[in-house]
Amino acid sequence: MHNKNNTILNMIKGESVSHTPVWFMRQAGRSQPEYRRLKEKYSLFEITHQAELCAYVTHLPVDNYNTDAAVLYKDIMTPLQPIGVDVEIKSGIGPVIHNPIKTIQDVEKLGHIDPKRDVPYVLDTIKLLTEEKLNVPLIGFTGAPFTLASYMIEGGPSKNYNFTKAMMYSDEATWFALMDHLVEMSITYTSAQIEAGAQIIQVFDSWVGALNVQDYRYYIKPAMNKLISGIKEKYNVPVILFGVGASHLADEWNTLPIDVLGLDWRLSIKEASSMNIDKTLQGNLDPSLLLAPWDVIEERLKAILDQGIAHGKHIFNLGHGVFPEVKPETLKRVTTFVHDYTQR
């Protein structure tokens, strides 16, 4: 590919770069006027199941904001339907699961994903983007076992994860069987994304902050090790791990075979660096700040970028996803500022 911008890959490898790379979680989709126009005609399901539409939405932020990576426009629920999870995305609520997991028999009933058969539209989207000469690396992704399991057990989003924790503490056989099943599914799903052309994988563990260190280490970490090792043993592709409200788990994450540790806004780059975290750090502007006046945004950007430069390996991102209310011109201005301020 002509003039490919590999800044993000070079940063992760520790090679020289011309600037700090930038991308935004949820950069594709709801904050873009072009996407909102599409949503007037098509449902979310229709957009994600039509490769041309999905590739268009994935490509938009690279063109509009000049980001250093594209992130596949999909939902972490995508691979669950093919294995027998009756999931519906409800507006204003999120994923609702009509057949929650309660027993070992429910886990045993789950099927196995065959990406070419079950999610061809995901692979077709990636291939289209590759053929379209996308000039930045494409990030594929999967949900992490805990976050997926929490939806599957609770039946949807939860504040306290009571049913999930109850299963962990009272029915280890079912819990670990579910972990194994989700690890196998995620390895198969991400492998297919990589073979289709994804160059980076991000594992989203959005809700893992609900656990303390002891429980994470015992109930979750073995599955995370298996998942990340399963990807890394087969492919020379960097893996990013991101969780929300989980700074207390940073030490545990640092010993996983990941390449990049994504931080939310609660733990600064400087603090993470001082904990001897040796991974590339990603983050971590509070997405709410994108609704603030520019001088406030700029001041926070400088602090994060200075800390990132001091750490050595840093990818600029938000501490969570872009809100629908954020103006596209703000995201473009942030990208331009990051590129200019960190010019090497």
From Swiss-Prot:
Reaction catalysis annotation: uroporphyrinogen III + 4 H(+) = coproporphyrinogen III + 4 CO2
Gene Ontology, cellular component aspect: cytosol
CDD domains xrefs: URO-D
Keyword annotations of the record: Cytoplasm, Decarboxylase, Lyase, Porphyrin biosynthesis
Enzyme class: lyase
Enzyme Commission code: 4.1.1.37
Family classification: Belongs to the uroporphyrinogen decarboxylase family.
Protein name: Uroporphyrinogen decarboxylase
Pathway: Porphyrin-containing compound metabolism; protoporphyrin-IX biosynthesis; coproporphyrinogen-III from 5-aminolevulinate: step 4/4
Cited InterPro entries: UROD/MetE-like_sf, Uroporphyrinogen_deCO2ase_HemE, Uroporphyrinogen_deCOase
Subunit structure: Homodimer.
Annotated substrate binding sites: R26, Q27, A28, G29, R30, F45, D75, Y151, S206, H320
Highest taxon above the source species: Bacteria
Task of the protein: Catalyzes the decarboxylation of four acetate groups of uroporphyrinogen-III to yield coproporphyrinogen-III.
Pfam families per UniProt: URO-D
Positions of the record's site feature: Transition state stabilizer: D75
Compartmental location: Cytoplasm
GO molecular function terms noted in the UniProt entry: uroporphyrinogen decarboxylase activity
GO biological process, one term: protoporphyrinogen IX biosynthetic process
Cystine connections: none
